């Protein structure tokens, strides 16, 4: 009797360990058979099902996603997206949410990878560093603020002294009709 209790005590943790490594998937086959998988050619993007056997259609941005489902299309978020779960459950008692973009600085499946780019911005799917040449070009071509020459008549934003001087001298004539400027 003691040996049966000892054997049970040793085998139960082993069985639970295998269940935890399957990511809570249900009805997974013992061995993956790709011929049993449905075609995913019509999908925009695919992900592995919870069993890790078949490619299934992935949910896109703004689409509904579920926490634990195996072999079902459109219920896991695709790469570069993460499921943001609601506090309530659906009619069947399953947790669900909406697929949203990975936060900046993360990428990949469920946004688990960290971006190692100098700018801190990378492609949310692949992790490839993103460059923004239009910002670099504009910064290289813009004149230095310190090299601009200023005259006594230049006024800063909100400084109306130069305008008051012109009005006081009588140099500024105002038209009696409102003038409309054409947009650029």
From Swiss-Prot:
Cellular component annotations (GO), alphabetically ordered: extracellular region
Residue ranges, annotated region (Disordered): 145-184
Gene Ontology terms: biological process: positive regulation of cell population proliferation; positive regulation of hepatocyte growth factor receptor signaling pathway; sprouting angiogenesis
Origin: domain of life: Eukaryota
UniProt cross-references to Pfam families, sorted A to Z: IGFBP (PF00219)
MF terms in GO: hepatocyte growth factor receptor binding; integrin binding
Cystine pairs: 28-51, 32-53, 37-54, 43-57, 65-83, 77-99
The name this protein goes by in its record: Endothelial cell-specific molecule 1
Organism: Mus musculus
